[in-house]
Amino acid sequence: MLMITSFANPRVAQAFVDYMATQGVILTIQQHNQSDIWLADESQAERVRVELARFIENPGDPRYLAASWQSGQTNSGLRYRRFPFLATLRERAGPVTWIVMIACVLVYIAMSLIGDQTVMVWLAWPFDPVLKFEVWRYFTHIFMHFSLMHILFNLLWWWYLGGAVEKRLGSGKLIVITVVSALLSGYVQQKFSGPWFGGLSGVVYALMGYVWLRGERDPQSGIYLQRGLIIFALLWIVAGWFDWFGMSMANGAHIAGLIVGLAMAFVDTLNARKRT
């Protein structure tokens, strides 16, 4: 996704978003210190910038007021507003993000129908030396989740962070982060608890570390994570380590994933700074 501009007045931001929707361009608003306007389809960036310049010159033009009225009264060109949650899901998620989400859901359904152990026998980290050449096992543990809260929590973060990485940096970058963090976080976790674990959280922590540090060191990348959220991630690791909530957490995977993400972001930002 590409951030187009920011407005201090959220109503002005909404007026521009409404008008562009009538032109067939879908923009989204994210509220931070100001109302940030984001574009999912970057091929339309130049067109949006031209329209933005016109809008800034005369935001009170009747066509903008008409577009705002239309967004509240009709469906023409603005049906996305009836289902903003679904529209946001589509706009923020690329193919890799969706494939992983669907795989997690399908595996969760299978575990609910035929039992956790049956699925784990096929997807868990190698639990016997004879299985060490079944290469998929070093990665497929990320698809297994053991409760509804477990999968919802992980998929929400995966969509939010993985989608941003894929939209801004490409599917290849998301694949690399996912594969490397799945392998290394899984390796560390099996040293902590043995092979019977699962979940996307090691990868999620890698994405947290990557997005946060990449945003801090390379703001032009267009990805960022609020510092409050990275603090939350660290507190969650501490809570899991000391078992404050009485829940079984993959602490080794969380710590390893976070370190992997930070390291990858550091390397990538070094390369970016060398190019500039």
Swiss-Prot record:
Topology in membrane: Multi-pass membrane protein
Known catalytic reactions: Cleaves type-1 transmembrane domains using a catalytic dyad composed of serine and histidine that are contributed by different transmembrane domains
Molecular function (Gene Ontology), one example: serine-type endopeptidase activity
Keywords: Cell inner membrane, Cell membrane, Hydrolase, Membrane, Protease, Serine protease, Transmembrane, Transmembrane helix
GO cellular component: plasma membrane
Xref: Pfam families: Rhomboid, Rhomboid_N
Keyword field contains Transmembrane helix: yes
Top-level division of the source organism's lineage: Bacteria
Keyword Cell membrane: yes
GO biological process, alphabetically ordered: proteolysis
Residue numbers annotated as active site: 201, 254
Cell location: Cell inner membrane
EC numbers on record: 3.4.21.105
HAMAP family: Rhomboid_GlpG (MF_01594)
Assigned protein family: Belongs to the peptidase S54 family.
Task performed by this protein: Rhomboid-type serine protease that catalyzes intramembrane proteolysis.
Alphabetical list of NCBIfam families matching this protein: PRK10907.1, rhombo_GlpG
Protein name, UniProt field: Rhomboid protease GlpG
